[in-house]
Amino acid sequence: MNDNETLFISSVDYIVFSVTLVLSTAVGFFYAYRDRKRNDIENFHRGNKKINPVAVSVSLSLSILPALTIISVAAEVYTYGTMIIWQVVGLLLGTAAGAHFFIPVFYQMNKISIFEYFQVRFGRIPKILCSLFFLINTILLISFALYAPCLAFEAMTGIPLWIVMAISAFVCMTYTLLGGIKAVIWAETLQFMIIIAGMVCILVEGSKAVGGFWKAWEVATIHKRIEFLNTSFDPRTRHTIWGLSIGVFFIWSKGFGSNQATLQRACSLKTLKTAQFVIWGSLPGTVLIVVLSMLTGVVMFAYYHTCDPVTEGRVVKNDQIFPLMILDVLSGTPGLPGLILACLVSAALSSISSGLSALSAVLIEDFVKPFSCKPLSDRTQLLLSKIAVMGSWNLV
């Protein structure tokens, strides 16, 4: 985006955005106060298995999805069309595998760290190696999850990147540190609602700008962006029913089979059946985000089909068109830009808090307790877990 193209932020927008951060932080303070007499490691990492299943389902809808799904799916539809929607089939199949193949194994183990499985099956060294790779991978992933939305925020507002990143990361660290897994789950539930509200807002306002959603659909159809039945077996074809369904199935199965954040939540529930219900319950929220992102891509194409921002030099690549559309469509409506910015940053917050909680659990369970000279008390483990959250935050 050009340096001189920034979004006009009114005081109302700042208030809307700030409220998002304040509410997320307040969740941490609430659970820190409510559980002040239950300060133990089991409560911090698994909520004593007394977490609302619906909240866990909503939390899972966000914790597995990449933070940039909103921007990337919309850009994909803008460039290549709606075939991307077939990833929903892969999501369905991957969810089934997670609920009925992976979750029963890890739930019955009843361990905070999922990498205990590797020690039982293969020995101590493979467990340590897998845990180490997980730590490195997660730090890199959540760093990128923080960087990309904050970069879009800077491009739209002109606020320096480091300030946005520092504030967002500090908010995440605060509510994760104070409230543990309960705060993470309920904060993500709040962030999910903000994300849905923001996406509906840009979809509605964008549709109005092009003469209605069906007008946008008609324009996209004329320019061959509406496509659902590409059954080609040519491996050079970007998107086909088979490629998306099968490819996303393996990706999503990995999310349920080797993702500490996901399995930590599922194993924080009272029974295996509840855990399986939660895995299935995460599917509607995930599909809703993907569908709204796809529809936003259709509207985005209709809005810019006669003046492609990349060709005109307004942006460098298609991933920047979504933030540009916010600038063009919403800049004159106080409050709405703040909601969309909150939507983007909420997507980052959910990924970061999930990662911090998972990193803390793995560090303590796999690298501190096994090498401790004597058994650690609950109080010591809790203190070390919180230090691990702060340390992970500093690395990010």
PLM features: what roles do these ranges have?
Residues 21-24, 63-64, 91-95, 134-138, ...:
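Residue-level recognition of pore/gate-forming positions within transmembrane alpha-helices
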Residues 121-128, 138-139, 162-165, 364-396:
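Loop-to-transmembrane helix boundary motifs in multi-pass membrane proteins
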Residues 25, 29, 152, 170-177, ...:
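Alpha-helical transmembrane segments of multipass membrane proteins
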Residues 2-70:
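Membrane-interface "cap" regions at the ends of multi-pass membrane proteins
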Residues 306-309, 315-353, 369-387:
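Membrane-embedded translocation segments of transport machinery
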Residues 2-10, 46-55, 72-86, 119, ...:
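Loop-to-helix junctions at membrane interfaces in multi-pass transport proteins
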Residues 61-62, 85-177, 226, 247-255, ...:
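Helix-loop-helix module between adjacent transmembrane segments
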Residues 31-34, 43-47, 61, 75-76, ...:
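Helix-loop junctions at the membrane interface of multi-pass solute transporters
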